[in-house]
């Protein structure tokens, strides 16, 4: 008996130990804590050092793109550019260059020869060959002619530039990281600027870059020649050369209907507007320019057609705005639905619905007394108002106060439910339908992009929303709204005293209580009912449900 009790006691201890092992760890996905067993065993998180501090690097700040034209040269992966791989045929050979020479036939040789300080390479059995100052394209012919002086036949020659002389070049002035940078003599100016981090986009110049050798200026470089015309003079660098980026010169800004909306730099005190436009590249259809001048205490604006740009000048600090300024001469509308005529019509600006209805060719199924009009500008406005209502609803649900812990938990669940509802409602696209009045439909002004729909005759009544079986029911004279709902199984249990609206075929919205008789083509929409202790939330959801039903003919459930 004692043995049996001992076995039970040991088993109970093991079970308690197992349960303690299971419960000792918090869920890291919920708490963000490390497993407690790892801490007890002396294990450390990967992001912690020996002192217990978190070594996780902070996220990198977002890169702010400069508006300065030319700054894109030094953005992205181009900053990691290496030395030039290929060589320019016009490259002039210098002491320190490495030359690959191959001889085969009666005499063979294969080796890399370095140009000595006197400008020579030494070929076995041939002697010194002076190649310094010779272009890369003439190298093979020169070496061949020297070999032929010794071996007149049965010896073939191939010579090529293997590696240019390594050099160190100073990059200074208004660059991000001034200093001394290594490369080869054939590297371009851009290579060295990239190694220095590029031109400082806030202070440096893209049009005033000087390359000096000692006290002598070797070249003046304008990077706009490269950006706009693809021209960049290739100069060979030597040890100790200096690239100097000057300070920012005069600037003007371009905005509006252009392909290059940037701030541009120029060297002179003024620049022709025609040249500025050639840099900015106006989009097709641009008609006018606005010049905003900021000089002294005054700010002036000048407005001209683009055709009058010749002869006008921009000065330092000016802003050039390119715009499209033309009036609407005609409009285009689409006619869809049940008719036998054209589906697109071009009309004079200011035309009315009468001009369209006179050209429509109705057929036997056309319901001409229920013409529908859909307008993009109305749809956009409906979307804006819907988003505003959704924003207010979300704010009301998240700012609700609670007096007890249980009430706070319920409020949190309600806020999550409303957030999911708001996310679904934001995806709804309103139709932009304009409700037409039969008495003055002919005088309705049309806009470009309007869609006119001629509905088709039907004998059905649609029932949507909070009914057991949403369906289409055959129209029958004398049947009421309640009768059609009963045909679809009646209201759902959660609908209660739901709001019911009727949408006529011409787009008119009417409360079900105000409908005397239903017509073929009507739609019955039973809106869901939502109750909350927060009056603002209840009012907000009810408003949004109605907007969705009326504006998009959509019923969303929570």
UniProtKB/Swiss-Prot annotation:
Described function = Involved in the translocation of the polysialic acid capsule across the outer membrane to the cell surface. May function as the periplasmic binding element of the PSA transport system, in which it transiently interacts with the membrane component of the transporter, binds polysaccharide and transports the polymer to a component in the outer membrane.
Disulfide connectivity for this sequence is none
List the Gene3D superfamilies.
Outer membrane lipoprotein wza domain like (3.10.560.10), wza like domain (3.30.1950.10)
A single GO CC term for this protein reads:
periplasmic space
Q: Which domain of life is it from?
A: Bacteria
Cell cycle listed as a keyword: no
What is the name of this protein? Polysialic acid transport protein KpsD
Q: In the UniProt record, does the keyword Cytoplasm occur?
A: no
Keywords from the named record: Capsule biogenesis/degradation, Periplasm, Signal, Transport
InterPro entries in the record: Poly_export, Poly_export_N, Soluble_ligand-bd
Single annotated GO MF: polysaccharide transmembrane transporter activity
Its family remark reads: To E.coli K1 KpsD.
Q: Where is the signal peptide?
A: 1-20
Q: Where in the cell is it found?
A: Periplasm
Q: Gene of origin?
A: kpsD
Q: State the taxonomy lineage.
A: Bacteria, Pseudomonadati, Pseudomonadota, Gammaproteobacteria, Enterobacterales
């Amino acid at each position: 008996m004692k043995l049996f009790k001992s076995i039970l006691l040991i088993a109970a201890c093991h079970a308690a130990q197992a349960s303690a092992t299971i419960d000792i760890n918090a869920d890291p996905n919920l708490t963000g804590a490390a497993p407690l067993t790892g801490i007890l065993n002396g294990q450390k998180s990967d992001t912690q050092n020996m002192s217990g501090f978190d070594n996780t690097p902070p996220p990198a700040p977002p890169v702010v793109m400069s508006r300065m034209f030319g700054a894109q040269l030094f953005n992205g992966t181009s900053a990691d550019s290496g030395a030039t791989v290929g060589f320019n045929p016009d490259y002039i050979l210098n002491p320190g260059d490495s030359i690959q020479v191959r001889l085969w036939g009666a005499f063979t040789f294969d080796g890399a020869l370095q140009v000595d300080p006197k400008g020579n390479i030494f070929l076995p059995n041939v002697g010194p060959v002076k190649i310094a100052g010779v272009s890369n394209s003439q190298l093979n012919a020169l070496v061949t002619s020297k070999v032929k002086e010794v071996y007149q036949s049965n010896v073939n020659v191939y010579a090529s530039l293997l590696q240019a002389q390594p050099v160190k070049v100073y990059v200074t002035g208004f660059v991000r990281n001034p200093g001394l940078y290594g490369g080869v003599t054939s590297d371009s100016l851009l290579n060295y600027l990239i190694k220095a981090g590029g031109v400082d986009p806030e202070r440096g110049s893209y049009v005033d870059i000087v390359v000096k050798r000692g006290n002598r200026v070797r070249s003046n470089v304008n990077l706009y020649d490269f950006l706009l015309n693809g021209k960049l003079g290739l100069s060979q660098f030597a040890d100790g050369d200096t690239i100097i980026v000057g300070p920012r010169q005069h600037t003007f800004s371009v905005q509006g209907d252009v392909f290059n909306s940037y701030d541009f730099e120029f060297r002179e005190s003024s620049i022709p507007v025609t040249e500025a436009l050639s840099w900015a590249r106006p989009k097709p259809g641009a008609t006018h320019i606005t010049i905003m001048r900021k000089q002294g205490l005054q700010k002036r604006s000048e407005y001209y057609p683009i055709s009058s740009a010749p002869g006008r000048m921009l000065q330092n600090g000016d802003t050039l705005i390119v715009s499209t300024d033309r009036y609407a001469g005609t409009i285009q509308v689409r006619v869809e639905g049940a008719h036998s005529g054209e589906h697109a019509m071009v009309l004079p600006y200011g035309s009315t619905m009468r001009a369209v209805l006179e050209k429509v060719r109705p057929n036997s199924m056309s319901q001409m007394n229920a013409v529908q009009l859909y307008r993009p500008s109305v749809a956009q406005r409906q979307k804006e108002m819907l988003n505003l209502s959704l924003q207010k609803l979300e704010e009301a649900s998240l700012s609700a106060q609670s007096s007890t812990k249980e009430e706070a938990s319920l409020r949190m669940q309600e806020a999550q439910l409303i957030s999911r509802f708001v996310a679904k409602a934001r995806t709804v696209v309103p139709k932009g339908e304009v409700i037409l009045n039969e008495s003055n439909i002919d005088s309705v002004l049309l806009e470009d992009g309007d869609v006119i729909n001629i509905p088709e005759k039907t004998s059905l009544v649609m029932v949507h929303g909070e009914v057991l079986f949403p369906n289409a029911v055959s129209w029958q004279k004398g049947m009421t709204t309640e009768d059609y709902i009963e045909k679809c199984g009646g209201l759902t249990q959660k609908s209660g005293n739901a709001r019911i609206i009727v949408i006529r075929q011409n787009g008119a919205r009417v409360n079900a209580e105000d409908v005397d008789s239903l017509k073929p083509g009507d739609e019955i929409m039973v809106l869901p009912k939502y109750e909350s202790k927060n009056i603002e939330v209840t009012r907000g959801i009810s408003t949004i449900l109605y907007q969705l039903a009326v504006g998009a003919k959509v019923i969303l459930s929570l």
